[in-house]
Amino acid sequence: MVTARPAGRGGRGARERILTAATTLFHREGIHATGVERLTEHAHVSKRTFYQHFSSKNDLVEEYLRRIHHAGGMPSEQAIDAADASPRGRLLAIFDSAPGSRLRGCPFHNAAVEAADAMPGVEDIVHEHKLDFTARLIHTATEAGARDPYRLGNQLAVLFEGAKALATSLNDTSPLLHARSAAETLIDAATIDSGK
C-alpha cells in the first residue's frame, strides 16, 4: 500500500508557500521573532525543503523585501503610480490609509531596524527601495509642475516616512491625515504658478 505525502508539504509551490508565510509572519510578528521552525510550520514544509529553496533565513528576508520592492512597495507607496489620478492626487494618495486598519509599519523600515548591522544584504535592499521611492516622488513632482521637484519629492518622502512611523507607533491613522494636510501645503507652495 502506498501512502500519500501529506497535502501541502514540500513539492510544487513550496517556495511560494515559504514566501507567503514570511510575508505574513514577518509583518505580524517581526523578522527576529520569526524563526525557521515557525516559518516551516506555517508554510507546511520541512526544514530540509526550506533550505533547498533558501540558503539561510537572511536569504529569505532579502527575497521577501525584493518581492515587495518589485511590486512597487506597500499599497500606500503603490498609489504614486496610479494611472487614474492626477500627479497632485497621486502625491497626496500616499498618505491615505484605511481607517481602523492595524498599522504594522513599513516592512523596509522594520527590516532596517531589525537588521541593524547584522544583515548587509537587507540594508542594501532597504536603501535601494527608499531611494527608488523618493525618485518616484521626484518624478511625480515634476509631472505636477513643481518648480523644484527634487526638493518637493524629498520633502514628501520625509513627511511620509515620519507620518508612517508615528502612525505605527500610536496605531492611529491621524498622523497620516495631518501629514496629508501638510503635503497639500507643500505641493501648493511648490506648484502655485504652474497651472497643473
Provide a role label for each language-model segment.
Residues 54, 59-68, 75:
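Alpha-helical DNA-contacting segments of helix-turn-helix folds
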